Regions:
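Gly/Pro-rich cap/lid or specificity-loop segments adjacent to the active site
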Residues: 32-318, 370-501
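Short helix-capping/linker segments at secondary-structure and domain boundaries
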Residues: 327-341, 345, 378-383
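Secretory targeting and sorting signals
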Residues: 1-32, 59, 196
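Short linear, low-complexity motifs centered on an aromatic residue
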Residues: 26, 340-342, 389-394
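Long, low-complexity segments enriched in small/aliphatic residues
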Residues: 344-376, 380
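Structural motif
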Residues: 305-321, 328-332, 358-366
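Amphipathic alpha-helical segments that form the core helices of the histone-fold
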Residues: 297, 323-325
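A general alpha-helix detector
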Residues: 265-266, 318-323, 335-338
Length: 501
């Protein structure tokens, strides 16, 4: 998928403390003296699957931008240079989803295809945000049972019970406050944006172009708000609502509607006659698929199935999370169908998806939690208010069973220093948005809110497609052409448009 469902708490979408220069009105930053841009010592990347053309380096950035000469963190950065220097027009930064996505790995996965698609028009660059991958990390020292994805996603217990969710959320917040240190408090969208501009300086570029996906669209939007004159051609692929009141918590809540929008695509696939040939047909008619999955999850709530992973059964919430992940891309439909079949067959032993079979690394869990909790103040709501929200969401959206509105560690987090950035139409008209009509993580409704906020700065291409993350992934030829043409020629549709093919 184009974001990272096994490594990210929201869209992966999440947030952290916004520092002083990002105000509630998000005016462009006032220039002030900064340390000289560091030199990047490029070398061949050594991580698995890195293409021969991919180079890596390390970039020092301030822990605290109010103390730029103080303690420094290290970011892993990467590039794939244009193979056509005569046609190169600039540098394009690939902004990963998340929070929790690795820019370096994203460039490994997409770099060769992107370089071919853009015909060498750009040097392609990316970095691991602070807290991610080979960059400086932090840990909350969480117990393994608190680091499973079905724990971090705060799925309610059977019948919507949230007592354990409340206890776990408080436990995680206290552990992060105790063990995370100043590094963890620095894991914010605002600092990722500052780090990206520091990377621009180190590259010697006056401007950057960008392709941001999922949570990366929010990072991209904040950068374009803070540094509007340093943006060239800006692509936001699969956006959420940027309203400061909706950041993080609202993104997660929207996943209930997103799953409902996307499920018909899976249901049609799972009941197509072609599934008879590969033995994966789940029902006779598409309308039978949702009740089948909901009832199977309820059965697994009562009677979890032993799996091929010792000590980790398939629970109802495990099935629900596996479905949520599968809805990101059509390619994941078949593995989920096999899981459903095995869960129904008393003679079979279900095989858990790898993202559910083991605890997430402590460093990844810390990043996932901290960014969403640091960026914005979450309501310190009562247990009763969360129970009401979960009950209402479970009734309306049985596939997600109340998880998207449930309590998270953010309810027990320290109060952030600043308000999040407000995205506005103040800036150059150089943004192209790409949005799926049936996105399980960033529903079209949220993308339309981003479009409204950007005003004449943006044009929106809505793709008649399901899945999350479109360009060179889950999209269609029409949407891909629109992005490629914009990045290579600067031409955008004159007005918002739909892409049916």
């Amino acid at each position: 998928m184009t974001t990272y469902p096994h490594k990210a708490l929201l869209l992966a979408l999440a947030t952290a403390t916004v520092a002083a220069s990002l105000t509630a009105t998000a005016a462009p930053a006032v220039a002030r003296p900064a340390p000289a841009a560091p030199q990047l010592d490029w070398h061949r990347c050594t991580h698995p699957d890195a293409p021969a053309a991919q180079e890596c380096a390390e970039l020092p950035v301030p822990l605290d931008y109010d103390d730029p000469d103080g303690r420094q963190l290290t970011l892993a950065v990467s590039r794939i240079r244009s193979d056509r220097p005569g046609t190169r027009r600039g540098t394009l930064v690939v902004i990963p989803g998340g929070p929790g996505g690795s820019g370096v790995q994203r460039l490994t996965q997409k770099g060769d295809a992107l370089r071919r698609e853009l015909a060498g028009a750009y040097d392609l660059v990316a970095f691991d945000p602070r807290g991610v991958g080979a960059s400086t990390t932090a840990s909350c020292d969480l117990a393994p049972e608190d680091r499973y994805l079905t724990s971090l996603r705060s799925w309610p217990g059977p019948n919507g019970e949230i007592t354990e969710n409340i206890a776990r959320s408080r436990r995680i917040a206290e552990a992060c406050a105790r063990s995370g240190g100043p590094e963890l408090r620095s894991f914010t969208t605002a600092n990722q944006v500052r780090d990206m501009d520091r990377f621009r300086e180190a590259l010697g570029e006056q401007k950057l172009s960008a392709w941001g996906t999922s949570y990366g669209t929010y990072v991209g939007a904040v950068y374009a708000q803070k540094y509007p004159r340093r943006t060239d051609r800006w692509v936001l692929d699969s956006s959420g609502d940027p309203d400061p009141k909706r950041v993080a918590r609202g993104w997660l809540a929207n996943m209930s509607q997103g799953a409902a929008d996307r499920l018909p695509d899976f249901a049609a696939w799972a009941t197509h006659p072609d599934r008879d040939r590969d033995g994966l047909r789940l029902a006779a008619a598409a309308q039978e698929v949702e009740p089948l999955v909901v009832s199977l999850a309820a059965r697994l709530d009562r009677e979890p199935r032993t799996t091929t992973t010792p000590g980790v059964p398939l629970t109802g919430n495990g099935l629900r999370q596996a479905l949520q992940n599968a809805l990101y891309a059509d390619a994941a439909f078949a593995p989920f169908a096999r899981l459903v079949q095995a869960a129904q067959d008393p003679a079979a032993t279900p095989v858990l998806p790898k993202e559910l079979a083991a605890p997430i690394r402590n460093e990844d869990a810390a990043l996932m939690v901290s960014v969403i909790c640091n960026d914005v103040a979450w309501p310190d709501a009562s247990a009763a208010s969360y129970r009401r929200a979960v009950d209402a969401d479970r009734a309306r959206y049985p596939l997600t069973a109340g998880m998207p509105v449930n309590v998270l560690p953010c309810a027990f987090w320290q109060t952030p220093v600043q308000k999040p950035t407000r995205i506005t139409d103040d800036g150059p008209s150089n943004i192209l948005m790409l949005q799926s009509r049936r996105d399980p993580a960033t529903p079209l409704s949220g993308g339309l809110k981003m479009r409204e906020a950007l005003g004449d700065r943006a044009r929106l291409v809505t793709v008649e497609q399901g899945g999350h993350g479109l360009y060179l992934g889950n999209g269609n030829a029409c949407g891909d052409r629109a992005v490629t043409e914009f990045l290579t020629s600067g031409r955008r549709p004159a007005r918002d448009t739909d892409c049916a093919n």
